Structures are given as C-alpha cells and as structure tokens.
From Swiss-Prot:
NCBIfam families reported for this sequence: PRK13971.1
Name of this chain's protein: Probable 4-hydroxyproline 2-epimerase
Record: residues binding substrate: G91, H92, H223, D249, G254, T255
Record-annotated active site: C90, C253
Species in which this protein is naturally found: Rhizobium meliloti (strain 1021) (Ensifer meliloti)
Length: 333
C-alpha cells in the first residue's frame, strides 16, 4: 500500500477549471506525445481518474501534466487530462496551463512573449501578454482544423432527429445549429443539454466513423457543441460544449471554437484574417481568428488561433491513498 502525492496548481480559463499537475506525474515512454499519451492511458489512467473524478475533482474538472518536449522546436510538452480521457489537444487547458506555468516559474520560454508546446495533436504555437508577474492574455495558434462531415442525422430520445456538422479542432465536435427540433441553446437548460448530449454522441458514433485522416490514433466523436445567438454585443455566436459524461464547458472552448471556425470557413462564412468572437454559456469570450489556409491529407483546412485569459485560484497537495476505496475516483451518473 502506498500514498501517491501530487502537487497541483488550480485555476480557471474564462470560468472552466484547469488543474496543472506540477509534481508527481509519471515517467512516460514514447518517441512523441501521442505515444506517451498511449502509455499514460495504458499504465497510469488511475492518476487521471483520481485527480479529475470525485472526490478530488468533479464533473467539469480538467487539467494537464508538464513534460520535457519530444521535439526540438518546442519549449514544453503537455499531456491533457480530464473527465473524458486524455485529449489530443485542449484550448482552454492550454491557456490555463501557460498562464499558471509562467506565473509560477514552471515554464520558461526561450523567447519572452512566445513559445511552442508539444501536444499529442501536434505543435501548438503560442504568444502571450505579460504585465509584471501576471499573464493577462494567451493566444494559441491551434493545429490544422477542418470540416469533417456535413448533414449527419441521428435520433435523440426526447428531442427527435438532430442534424449536425462534424468538425475537427483538436478533437471531433458535432455542431448543432438551429433546426426544427433545436432552435437555440437559450431555449433549454444546461440540464437538458447534458441529458441529450450523451445520447446524441452515442448515436452518431454508432452510425458513423470519425478518424483523423493523418493520425488514425485520433478517432471517435467526443464533444457536442450546441449553438445559439450571442448575448454579448461583441460576440458573433454563443455555444455550450458538452464533454465527458455530465460536463458543460464554462469557457467558450478552445478546440470547439477552432472546430466552429473551421466549419464556418469551409462554408464560405469566414476567410483568412477574419475574426470570430465566441461566447460561452456563462458569457465569457474567446477571440478567434482564421490565420491561414491549410491541408490535412486531401481535405481543405484552416489554421485557427484562439485568445483568452486565465486566473490561478489556489495551490493543492493531493493524495491518492491505495487504502482508499475511492482512490481512483468515481462518477455519479
């Protein structure tokens, strides 16, 4: 029997939690972060569930673990952990990790104001604005993002037929726009969205296959993005992103915003240089932009960037005690 100790810095990005594991992360094998992610999931997923699930975490918890980069053009490597698994990429997690990492001396960029992270989804370039010891804004240039499929239909109990577009922005997202059985996220409670989302996700995954054309290790639809009209005057759209089993992202969701920008660009509604301000379910904002056109295999894609802010809320020392019957956490469904 042993007690495993993890040093953590807690914070949030535009309202959504980030738990940065600053000490206690396991040594991982692999030539790149995708391979290290696979090793973590095989041997150490109990760390993720122990730190993210109750009683040490909660339904919305997400976090990250820092590692030395596996490639010479990056300053630091990041493994993203959350209630739904180890994401290839996490936008709000990146903003929070960079903010708290720099403010607490865990990350030292080679060039002030900019750095690159080595994520399982690939290299992510970042700029940040620092005033004194505080990082006030982080902008990440995300991985190539693209519209994967249009007009996919699935039946959802209690809602009826729902038609979605699926786009990739670091994870696969089903984007639910206004239609016969869903007019606007504002017409529904968060509880209703949480109830419908896993049914819609399961139906889509059962009916269709979602595989990244260049990275077959990245597969499966993981997130549902419900959309609506903005309530903030500077925003172009509002969204509520469902992930895990019961979570609605409190931030506008970085990879979700990337996927949304890719979808709109593919439909001719955004072009290179255009900005897209995305509002979350609680009114916080991410500032997105189409940075460049790109290709992913034979698919047209874009390079999106996302800007947002984060704040540190505390420092934790967390124990996972092998004697604890809930050492690896639990989820109440």
């Amino acid at each position: 029997m042993a007690t495993h100790t993890f040093s953590c810095i807690d914070g949030h990005t535009c309202g959504n939690p980030v738990r940065l594991v600053s000490g206690g992360g396991p040594r991982l094998e692999g030539a790149n972060m995708l391979e290290k992610r696979a090793h973590f999931l095989k041997e150490f997923d109990w760390i993720r569930t122990g730190l993210m699930f109750e009683p040490r975490g909660h339904d919305m918890m997400s976090g990250s673990i820092l590692y030395p980069p596996t490639r010479p053009d990056c300053d630091v490597a990041v493994l993203f952990i959350e209630t739904s698994g180890c994401l290839p990429m996490c936008g709000h997690g990146t903003i929070g990790t960079i903010t708290m990492g720099i403010e607490n001396g865990l990350i030292t960029p080679r060039e002030p104001g900019k750095l690159s992270i080595d994520a399982p989804a690939g290299k992510v370039d970042i700029t940040y604005r620092q005033e004194g010891r505080f990082v006030e804004e982080v902008r990440l240039t995300n991985v190539p993002s693209f519209l994967y499929a249009e007009g996919l239909a699935a039946e959802v109990e209690g809602l009826g037929e729902i038609v979605v577009d699926v786009a990739y922005g670091g994870n696969f997202y089903a984007i639910v726009e206004p239609q016969k059985n869903f007019r606007d996220m504002a017409d529904h409670t968060a509880g209703e969205l949480v109830g419908w989302s896993p049914k819609l996700r399961a139906a889509l995954n059962a009916k269709y296959e979602f595989v990244h054309p260049e990275h077959p290790e990245i597969r499966g639809l993981s997130h549902i993005q419900w959309t609506g009209k903005p309530t903030q005057p500077e925003a172009h759209a509002r969204n509520a992103v469902f992930y895990g089993e019961k979570a609605i992202d409190r931030s506008p969701c970085g990879t979700g915003t990337s996927a949304r920008i890719a979808q709109l660009a593919a439909k001719g509604k955004l072009k290179v240089g255009d900005e897209f301000v995305h509002e979350s379910i609680i009114g916080s904002l991410f500032k997105g932009r189409v940075e460049a056109a790109a290709k992913v295999a034979d698919r047209d894609a874009i390079i999106p960037s996302i800007a947002g802010w984060a704040r540190m809320t505390g420092i934790n020392t967390i124990f996972i005690d092998d004697r604890d019957p809930f050492a690896h956490g639990f989820v109440v469904r």
